[in-house]
């Protein structure tokens, strides 16, 4: 009996340490879902590391990380929430890099055409919305909503539209409202609009109408796997994947 126990112990001690595979937890803005999934799939073919992804609104993810969520990397849809973690002492300032850029568009359900109108025409907005609401992410917390508010303010129609909003917890939920026809118009990222054949882009907002839409990537610790993942993201292969999903490259 003792020999059996010793034999089993030796086998256990010499067995491959499958559980020792390093794990990276990547917390990323909802608008990055499809692109990050593709990046993870490509990276996993070449590296022996487990990548766990968590998606949501940047504000929600930042607060989860502040509360102790086990994130190794955080991809925000704006600089504010990455800076928030820097201010909280959870990320060093030199551990934040810009991953990609995006743009903002107005969308409608593909099956529900709307008459063309000028962004500055408040009456035309009211006519297009009729008895419904404009789908946007939360304008005071979620980056996509914050950019939408800035764009509407720039167009001079914010006072008329502020009470006509259907605000959601993240940009993908705003997209879904338009996809289902529950909102006749919505403001989302170009990358989100390109993913759905259920919505059509009505027009794009000028880059001057809102702050630059940048995606900072914050490194929360010094795991060796973090450095390898970051090096991969700078590669041509990773940049091509991001561009395939409509993201724009950014020079640091």
PLM segments and residue spans:
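Short active-site segment of divalent metal-dependent hydrolases/proteases
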Residues: 75
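Sec-dependent signal peptide recognition
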Residues: 1-8
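Exported/periplasmic ABC-transporter solute-binding proteins
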Residues: 20-46, 52-55, 59, 63-69, ...
């Amino acid at each position: 009996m003792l020999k059996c126990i010793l034999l089993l112990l030796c086998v256990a001690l010499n067995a491959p340490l499958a559980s020792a595979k390093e794990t990276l937890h990547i917390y990323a803005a909802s608008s990055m879902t499809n692109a990050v999934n593709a990046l993870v799939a490509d990276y996993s073919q070449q590296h022996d590391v487990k990548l766990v992804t968590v998606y949501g609104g940047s504000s929600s993810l930042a607060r989860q990380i502040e509360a102790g969520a086990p994130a190794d990397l955080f991809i925000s849809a704006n600089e504010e929430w990455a800076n928030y973690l820097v201010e909280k002492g959870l990320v060093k300032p030199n551990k934040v890099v810009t991953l990609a850029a995006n743009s903002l568009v107005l969308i409608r359900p593909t099956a529900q055409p709307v008459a063309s109108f000028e962004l500055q025409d408040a009456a035309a907005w009211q006519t297009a919305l009729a008895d419904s609401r404009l789908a946007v992410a939360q304008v005071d917390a979620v980056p996509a909503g914050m950019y939408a508010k800035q764009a509407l303010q720039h167009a001079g129609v914010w006072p008329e539209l502020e009470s006509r909003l259907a605000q959601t917890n993240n940009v993908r939920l705003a997209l879904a409202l338009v996809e289902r026809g529950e909102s006749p118009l919505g403001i989302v990222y170009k990358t989100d609009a390109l993913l759905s054949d259920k919505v059509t882009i009505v027009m794009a907002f000028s880059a001057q109408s809102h702050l630059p839409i940048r995606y900072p990537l914050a490194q929360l610790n010094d795991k060796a796997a973090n450095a390898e993942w970051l090096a991969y993201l700078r590669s041509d292969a990773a940049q091509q994947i991001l561009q395939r999903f409509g993201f724009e490259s950014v020079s640091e």
